[in-house]
Amino acid sequence: MNKLAFSRELRLLTPEHYKKVFQQAHRAGSPHLTILARPNDLNHPRLGLAVPKKQIKTAPGRNHFKRIVRESFRLKQHDLPANDFVVIAKKSASELSNEELFKLLDKLWHRLSRLSRG
């Protein structure tokens, strides 16, 4: 059985980690969010989140968005390639229901998985 935790090793923690992803990344986007991906040297994917106040105004809104993205990543982590992912929220992301956001994330995870596998 696969372990479905979201431990510290599955997160991008330092500004250098984020900088690497922003420099050369595959991009999958929608009007609501963008996911950047770049291969890493580890044997597992890692997740970073960028949710600007300018895009989602309230702290509960930003926290809700991050919680949903982390949960989607946690459930999909074993299907994802060994990439560093950064999810960037756009203004309209706060208007999506949980179900719509999960479906959108699934679609984008799948698209990035195909891109990185060739």
From Swiss-Prot:
GO biological process: tRNA 5'-leader removal
Pfam family, one: Ribonuclease_P
GO CC terms, sorted: ribonuclease P complex
Entry EC no(s): 3.1.26.5
Gene3D superfamilies documented for this protein: 3.30.230.10
Domain of life of the source: Bacteria
Molecular function terms, GO-annotated: 3'-tRNA processing endoribonuclease activity; ribonuclease P activity; tRNA binding
Coiled-coil residues: none
Catalytic activity as recorded in UniProt: Endonucleolytic cleavage of RNA, removing 5'-extranucleotides from tRNA precursor
UniProt entry keywords in alphabetical sequence: Endonuclease, Hydrolase, Nuclease, RNA-binding, tRNA processing
Cystine connections: none
Function in brief: RNaseP catalyzes the removal of the 5'-leader sequence from pre-tRNA to produce the mature 5'-terminus. It can also cleave other RNA substrates such as 4.5S RNA. The protein component plays an auxiliary but essential role in vivo by binding to the 5'-leader sequence and broadening the substrate specificity of the ribozyme.
Family assignment from sequence similarity: Belongs to the RnpA family.
Quaternary structure note: Consists of a catalytic RNA component (M1 or rnpB) and a protein subunit.
Protein name, as recorded: Ribonuclease P protein component
Gene of this entry: rnpA
